C-alpha cells in the first residue's frame, strides 16, 4: 500500500472523483495536517440538495411500488444525465393518492373485521343488535364460556349467555371497572358495535361492504402494479445512480483546495499507481499532479488471497485484522487449522458426518426452502450467534478439515469408535507415545516458525531491538526443547563425545537470554516459562483425540453389552444410548477441535509475531446491481 496525493484544477473535481469511484482502488483520507493548513475546505457541490431530494423521492417510489425484476443495466454518462432521467418520472400525485386511498380502505376493512369478530358470537340469534348499546350503557362479548361470571357481580351488570360466550352490559361509568376485573381474571372483552338489525343481517351487510372495499383495494394495487411495470426498472436504476452520486458528494468533505485547485489524498495498492495515474491524467487532460506521499502512518490492510484460501480470512478478521505492514497469516491458518482439526477428530465416521453437515449448510444457505423443517428454536439460536453467510463460511472451512479427519480415521481404523476396517495402519493406543512426541515436535516447529516470522518482520520494519528479542526467544525455545527431548531419549550428559547436542542447547539458551533482556529486561525472565508451556500446549492435539476415541468406545461398549444381554429393554436402552451418545460426541468433535485448533494458532503461534489491530482497506467505490460505470474520460461529470 502507498499513499498518494492528487492536485488538479477545480474545474476537474467532479470527473476526478468519478474516475476514482469507478476505479475503486483508492481509500480517500483526510488531508495531512501540514498540507491542511495551507488549503481551505472544498466548496460544497451545487447539486447536493437536488441529488438528495431526488434520492429521497426515488427511494420512496421503490419502497411503495410492487417489486419487479430489473433485467438490464443502465449507463449514465454524467450527473446531468441522471437528473434529466429522474425529472422525466413524476408520479408523486399518482402514488400519494393511491397510498392514501389504500390506507383509508385498510382502516375501513380493519374496522369491519373488528365488528364482525363480535357479531360472529351472535350468529343465529333473533334479536336486534341495537338493544345492547345506548346513551348510558355499553355491552361487550366475553368469548369464553368457562369464565367466572361471579367476578362481575359488583358491577350490577346484565349478563346474557350465548352458545360459546357471554354478553355483559354495564353502565357507561363502570366500563373501566369492567376492564380492570376482566384483566384480573384473564378474560377478553370485545365491544359490541353500535349497529341496527339482526346479527345475521348485519353480518351479511358488513361482508358486502368488505367485499366492495376489497375490490377497491385490488383496483388500487393493480394501478400501482401498472406503474411498477412501467417505471420500476428505471426507478431502481436511477435510485442506485443517485446513491452513488450522493456518496461522491459525501467524499467531497475530505477534499481541500483553493479557489482554482483542489487536492485529494488516499491509500492505493502499490500495483495500482499506474492505473490511477493514467485514468486521472486522461480525465484532466494531463492537467494534474499525482505523487506519492512519504508518511509514517500505518496503512490500511488489504487482504489478497486465492479464492479458496480467502474464506479463511473470516477467522483472521474474527481474531484481529493484521496491520498494513504485517504479514497476512491467512494462508498459514488455511493450511494448519484443517490438519489440527482433523488430527483431533481422528475418526472417519465423525469426519464424514461433519462433511455432509457442512455441504448441507452450504446448500441450505444458497437455496433456502420456503418452509423449514428445522425446529425454530434451534435455527433462531444458531442465527443469533452467526449470520447465514458466516455460517456458510464456517461450513466451507470445515470441508478440508473433515477430509483430514476422514484420512486420520482411516489410518486409525476408527468409525464412530468401531474398528470396522479389516486393517489398522496405526492403532491409537499403540502409537500414543509417538503421537505425543510428534505433537511436541509440531509445537516446537510452530513456535520456532512464529519467531522466525517475527524476526523477519522486525528487520523489515528496521526494529533492531525487536529482531534481537525474537532471535533470543528462538534460541531459548530451541535450547529448552532440545534438552527436554534428550531427557526423554537419552541420559542427560554434557560430555563432548556423548552430549554435544546438550552443549549446543545450553549455548543457545545462554546466548538467547541476553538477547531477550536487551528489549524486555526483567520482564523477559517472567515470560520464559510461558514458552515451554506454549510448546507443550500442542500436546492437546493428542489429548483431545484420545478423549474423543475413549468416549466413542465407551458408548459402543455399552451398546454391545446391551445387545448381548438377551433383554429387549436393555437392547432398546443401548440403541438410545448409542444414538444420543454418538450425537453428543459428534457435537464435541465439531466444537472442541475447532476451538482448540484455532486457539493453538491464535495464542501459541500468533503471539510470536502478530500484532493485529489493523484497519480494513475500504476503497471509495459502490457495488452496482442496476447500473454500469458511467465514466466518460473525455467529458466532465
UniProtKB/Swiss-Prot annotation:
Function: Component of the A-type ATP synthase that produces ATP from ADP in the presence of a proton gradient across the membrane.
Keyword line: Cell membrane, Hydrogen ion transport, Ion transport, Membrane, Transmembrane, Transmembrane helix, Transport
Protein's GO biological process: vacuolar acidification
Species lineage: Archaea, Methanobacteriati, Thermoplasmatota, Thermoplasmata, Thermoplasmatales
Membrane topology designation: Multi-pass membrane protein
PANTHER family listed in its UniProt record: V-TYPE PROTON ATPASE SUBUNIT A (PTHR11629:SF63), VACUOLAR PROTON ATPASES (PTHR11629)
Pfam assignment, any one: V_ATPase_I
Family: Belongs to the V-ATPase 116 kDa subunit family.
MF terms (GO), sorted A to Z: ATPase binding; proton-transporting ATPase activity, rotational mechanism
UniProt organism field: Thermoplasma acidophilum (strain ATCC 25905 / DSM 1728 / JCM 9062 / NBRC 15155 / AMRC-C165)
Name of this protein: A-type ATP synthase subunit I
Compartments, as annotated in UniProt: Cell membrane
Transmembrane segments: 342-362, 403-423, 436-456, 471-491, 498-518, 541-561, 568-588
Main location: membrane
Domain of life where this protein originates: Archaea
Amino acid at each position: 500500500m502507498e499513499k498518494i496525493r492528487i492536485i488538479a484544477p477545480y474545474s476537474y473535481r467532479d470527473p476526478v472523483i468519478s474516475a476514482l469511484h469507478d476505479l475503486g482502488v483508492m481509500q480517500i483520507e483526510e488531508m495531512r495536517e501540514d498540507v491542511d493548513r495551507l488549503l481551505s475546505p472544498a466548496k460544497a457541490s451545487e447539486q447536493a440538495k437536488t441529488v438528495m431530494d431526488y434520492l429521497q423521492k426515488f427511494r420512496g417510489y421503490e419502497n411503495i411500488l410492487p417489486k419487479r425484476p430489473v433485467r438490464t443495466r443502465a449507463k449514465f454518462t454524467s450527473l446531468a444525465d441522471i437528473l434529466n432521467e429522474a425529472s422525466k418520472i413524476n408520479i408523486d400525485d399518482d402514488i400519494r393518492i393511491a397510498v392514501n386511498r389504500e390506507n383509508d380502505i385498510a382502516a375501513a376493512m380493519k374496522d369491519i373485521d373488528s365488528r364482525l369478530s363480535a357479531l360472529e358470537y351472535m350468529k343465529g340469534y333473533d334479536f336486534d343488535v341495537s338493544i345492547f348499546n345506548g346513551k348510558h350503557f355499553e355491552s361487550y362479548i366475553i368469548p369464553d364460556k368457562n369464565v367466572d361470571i361471579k367476578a362481575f357481580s359488583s358491577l350490577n351488570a346484565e349478563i346474557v349467555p350465548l352458545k360459546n360466550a357471554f354478553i355483559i352490559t354495564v353502565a357507561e361509568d363502570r366500563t373501566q371497572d369492567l376492564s380492570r376485573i376482566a384483566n384480573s381474571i384473564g378474560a377478553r372483552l370485545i365491544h359490541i358495535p353500535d349497529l341496527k338489525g339482526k346479527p345475521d343481517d348485519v353480518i351479511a351487510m358488513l361482508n358486502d361492504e368488505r367485499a366492495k372495499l376489497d375490490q377497491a383495494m385490488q383496483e388500487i394495487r393493480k394501478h400501482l402494479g401498472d406503474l411498477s411495470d412501467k417505471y420500476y426498472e428505471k426507478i431502481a436504476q436511477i435510485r442506485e445512480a443517485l446513491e452513488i452520486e450522493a456518496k461522491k458528494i459525501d467524499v467531497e468533505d475530505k477534499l481541500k483546495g483553493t479557489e482554482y485547485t483542489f487536492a485529494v489524498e488516499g491509500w492505493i495498492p502499490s500495483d495500482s499507481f499506474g492505473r490511477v495515474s493514467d485514468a486521472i491524467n486522461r480525465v484532466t487532460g494531463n492537467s494534474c499532479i499525482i505523487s506519492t506521499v512519504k508518511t509514517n502512518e500505518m496503512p490500511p490492510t488489504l487482504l489478497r488471497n486465492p479464492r479458496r484460501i480467502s474464506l479463511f480470512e473470516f477467522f483472521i478478521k474474527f481474531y484481529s485484522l493484521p496491520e498494513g505492514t504485517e504479514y497476512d497469516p491467512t494462508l498459514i491458518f488455511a493450511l494448519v487449522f484443517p490438519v489440527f482439526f482433523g488430527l483431533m477428530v481422528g475418526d472417519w465416521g465423525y469426519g464424514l458426518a461433519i462433511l455432509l453437515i457442512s455441504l448441507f449448510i452450504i446448500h441450505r444457505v444458497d437455496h433456502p426452502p420456503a418452509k423449514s423443517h428445522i425446529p425454530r428454536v434451534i435455527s433462531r439460536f444458531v442465527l443469533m450467534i452467526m449470520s447465514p453467510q458466516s455460517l456458510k463460511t464456517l461450513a466451507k472451512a470445515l470441508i478440508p478439515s473433515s477430509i483430514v479427519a476422514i484420512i486420520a480415521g482411516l489410518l486409525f481404523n476408527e468409525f464412530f469408535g468401531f474398528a470396522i476396517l479389516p486393517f489398522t495402519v496405526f492403532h491409537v493406543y499403540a502409537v500414543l507415545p509417538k503421537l505425543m512426541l510428534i505433537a511436541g515436535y509440531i509445537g516446537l516447529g510452530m513456535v520456532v516458525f512464529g519467531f522466525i516470522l517475527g524476526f523477519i518482520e522486525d528487520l523489515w520494519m528496521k526494529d533492531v531491538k525487536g529482531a534481537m528479542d525474537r532471535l533470543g526467544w528462538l534460541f531459548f525455545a530451541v535450547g529448552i526443547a532440545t534438552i527436554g527431548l534428550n531427557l526423554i531419549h537419552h541420559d542427560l550428559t554434557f560430555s563432548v563425545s556423548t552430549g554435544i547436542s546438550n552443549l549446543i542447547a545450553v549455548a543457545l539458551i545462554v546466548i538467547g537470554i541476553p538477547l531477550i533482556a536487551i528489549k524486555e529486561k526483567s520482564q523477559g525472565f517472567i515470560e520464559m516459562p510461558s514458552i515451554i508451556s506454549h510448546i507443550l500446549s500442542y500436546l492437546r492435539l493428542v489429548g483431545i483425540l484420545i478423549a474423543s476415541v475413549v468416549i466413542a468406545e465407551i458408548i459402543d461398549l455399552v451398546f454391545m453389552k446391551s445387545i448381548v444381554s438377551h433383554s429387549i429393554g436393555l437392547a432398546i436402552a443401548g440403541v438410545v444410548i448409542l444414538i444420543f451418545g454418538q450425537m453428543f460426541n459428534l457435537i464435541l468433535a465439531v466444537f472442541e477441535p475447532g476451538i482448540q485448533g484455532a486457539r493453538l494458532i491464535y495464542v501459541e503461534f500468533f503471539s510470536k509475531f502478530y500484532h493485529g489491530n489493523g484497519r480494513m482497506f475500504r476503497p471509495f467505490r459502490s457495488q452496482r446491481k442496476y447500473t454500469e460505470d458511467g465514466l466518460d474520460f473525455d467529458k466532465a461529470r
